[in-house]
Amino acid sequence: MADLLSHRQFFGDRERDFALTPEMITELERVTGRGIGGLCRAMFAGDFHHAEIVHTVRLGLIGGGVSPEEAGALVAAFAHPRPLSETYPLAVAILETLWFGSSETKRDRE
């Protein structure tokens, strides 16, 4: 699923794709109570709730092709118990890819 709006990064036990599809954006807005623009602005500024990080990662995994059950298990094992210094940059990278596009794809086109 390597395209303009997917982010690929090691998470858990291997490299995984993260993508916020339109359906996942709607769900992210619902579970966080913020519109996607407000959530992005807040996360980029470092103003976030832990749950927003976890939901962004979980929904990014689902949008990237992981089943909802597996995404929940991965987040429970590799996001909830980990330091914010590990999970926050991943959540921001997922949202930055949604906002700006994939930096790898941009570099490939240049």
Question: Residue ranges of each PLM-predicted region?
Answer:
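Charged interaction scaffolds used for protein-protein
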Residues: 1-11, 15, 30-45, 51, ...
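Short linear motifs in exposed loops
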Residues: 19-21
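A general alpha-helix detector
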Residues: 24, 52-60
